[in-house]
Amino acid sequence: MKKVIIVGGGISGLTAGIVLQNSGFETHIYEKNPIGGGELTGWKRDGIYIDNCIDWLTNSKADDSEMYALWKDIGMLGEDIMMCSKDKFFSYTADGKTVTFWRDLERTRKEMLEISPEDEENIEKFINTVKIGEVFTVPANKPMDKFGLKELKKFMPFLKGMGAIRKAYAGMSLQDLADSFKSPVIGKAFTMMHPANTQAFSFIVSYATITSGSGDIPVGGSLAAALRICDRYKEVGGTLHTNCPVKKIVIAGKAASGVLLEDGTEVNADYVIAATDANHCFTKLLPAEYMPKKMKAVFDDKEHYSTFSKFHAIYLIDGKVGIPEDTSFWKCDGPMIGRTKMNACGTLCYDYDPETYPAEDKTLIQVKVIQYLEDCLEWIDLASKDKAAYDARRQEYADRLMAEIVKRYPEAEGKIRLIDTWTPATYASRCNSYNGAYMSFVADKDSKTVTTPGVIKQLKNVFLAGQWNMGSGGLPPAAVQGKFAAWRICKKEGVPCK
């Protein structure tokens, strides 16, 4: 039985481990944190559950898609796991008008036309393109660079659909899309969920996931999902070593002999999968020159590929004060959060999940504010050099956001309290995340998203897994990249990938 060491117990590492165990390998995952899951996680403060990750889960619909099958295989989803059904993507209110991106696409069309009949042509184009995007799915059985005619034929509707969307909004960012509308309320709504420099294509595909009914949330949230996946890995015979960081991958000629742990222990293996942040992999685990050329080109091209993260704050309110469940934004003349001047504020209200919100007479909300590179680096630097100043800034920003919530919902005055905050420095510390980013690169409107095969040409038995291998990242790319690393090992050994 061949032995595989997996560095990193996030969604990629766990997926690779489950697939390899099912395919007849012995696997060991080495994870630096007390539990597996990586950014798929949550925690408790004052007895209140705080969710870090899932706002919607692509390919969550129980169908015959490859991605749904993978979600089932690893324990993310299943017939016995209840789902929170999203009735909207989000809403935005300004100047007495509300734009809602409903799950019911026709309702969205109708309401947008009522707000701005003069935008009819633009609205119809947007709605019809979202309909096309409902074919979106994530190929999950084998890497796309290994597709043959059979796979190309199977995914032709998907490939044609994505091509049609890219053609319809070629060379357009979300800001460009927003500016194309005569209605400032409709236009501004498009820039609420994603950074304004994101390709319009990405927003359309994200929204289409909701309208297709394939973007719901498993009850219990991210931590429950992570623990299910960890349990599945152990059930199939895998060994998860927690609180066990890896110092480097040990190289012997054109192969790796294993890994060296931070405590000085050397562990040998036939294969190694680096299921970590890509920058961490090629600055700590392996020499920088081993980074694949396609990946390095993206890291080097800072003009067209950027990273971002967010400042997060969680609040608990005694009672119900009119905050709608799920995600809603409103126009405000808000404070500075880092270098971001808030002209809109939003809440994610967890009333939709009976297992995570605290009580029927309470309201739990999260506020997120985008932080771009300079702010992210400043958070990381401050956290490492002056913990007291870092904590003070977190509190200051949380107080500013609380004031905006009370302005919008006056009944919350005297009833709202801060539960917790976290920042780009949290992701950098916990997950070794590049620039504190919780997702991969944002490709601008003049660029293409890049998928890097998880192969290191100089090393015959080391493979890469993780969201940084695939487009803008996220949970589905992280999972499938773990599956693909396992697939490549199975292929080399001549065994079926299960």
Regions found by a protein language model. Name each.
Residues 217-218, 247-360:
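Mid-domain catalytic core of redox enzymes
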Residues 318-422:
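C-terminal segments that line or cap access tunnels to active or ligand-binding sites in enzymes
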Residues 2-135:
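N-terminal glycine-rich phosphate/pyrophosphate-binding loop and immediately adjacent elements
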Residues 131-236, 243, 430-445:
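Active-site/ligand-binding neighborhood in enzyme catalytic cores
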Residues 184-197, 410-471:
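A glycine-rich dinucleotide-binding beta-alpha-beta segment and adjacent secondary-structure elements
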Residues 251, 491-498:
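Active-site-proximal substrate-binding core of FAD-dependent oxidoreductases
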Residues 239-240, 244-257, 421-433:
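Beta-rich nucleic-acid/ligand-interaction surfaces
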Residues 467-490:
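A conserved FAD-binding loop/helix module that cradles the flavin
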